[in-house]
Amino acid sequence: MNDISSNTIQKEPFSIKHIVVSGGGQYGLTMYGILKEAHAKGFWKYENIKSMYGTSIGSFVCLIIILHYDWDILDRYFVERPWEKVFNFDLHTIMYAFENRGLFDQINFDELLKSLLLGKDMPINITLKGLYEITGIDLYITTSEVTNFELIVLSHKTHPDWRVLDAIYASCSLPIIFSPIIKNGCCYVDGGLFSGYPLNLSIKDGCNPDEVFGIRKISSNQREPLNTQSSLFDIVKHIMLNAMKSFNIIPLNSIRHEIIIYGNHTSFEGIIRFSTSKEERNKLIEEGSDIFTQFYKGLL
């Protein structure tokens, strides 16, 4: 199990109104497990949630929560679905990557979410504005625009006509693994480049820190050194990680309810392991449940 730390002071009753979820690759399932267990224990309630902030896989997790499915349905979706058919990796994938600017593209990614939208009678082309009108929850998604090299926050307020699927994909487009999304002359990649954990955005928007529940994944500083056996992905990963370290230097606000997950860096191998192993996916979810249970004991 991953090491965790927590910052908690307040006793029950809890009044969580805002949820912030960082990037974290395959650890998105751990974050899902945390939120699932937190809901089961009454730490947060759907009817109280006003806004959600997500970066990269965190934006995916936020959308999953906003759609308000039964947890059993989501468990089956994550564990039983044949993810290896969505992320099929073979020689064709490698050859296609050079032309497509990434191993996988939005077609692969849309497969992850369209069934969940359709299951709630939402069109697959639903916009951020349309999602807000149905759910009443503000969803803020970070992405990195590389043409102007700046952080972009997508929401129904600033980008109402963006498709939800485009916004989530733009936030999750880790270079090399996913091709970037290009719209109106702008190129969008993973939101973690400039804002791996959008906690400060929530506070800047006026969220009461005592009403924010933050889930943050921090990667180990240990990395395999580059050598003659290193792959193109290894090199790009080092560049991205160093860039993220350089750009994510603004001190984070302090909140009472925060869980920090310590784990490995997002890797191609980790994504493949996630997509091909039911046991791995179930393990990540159960770890999230255990992490929140330990966190919750500190509140009582």
For the regions a protein language model found, what residue spans apply to each?
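Patatin-like phospholipase
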Residues: 1-55, 63-300
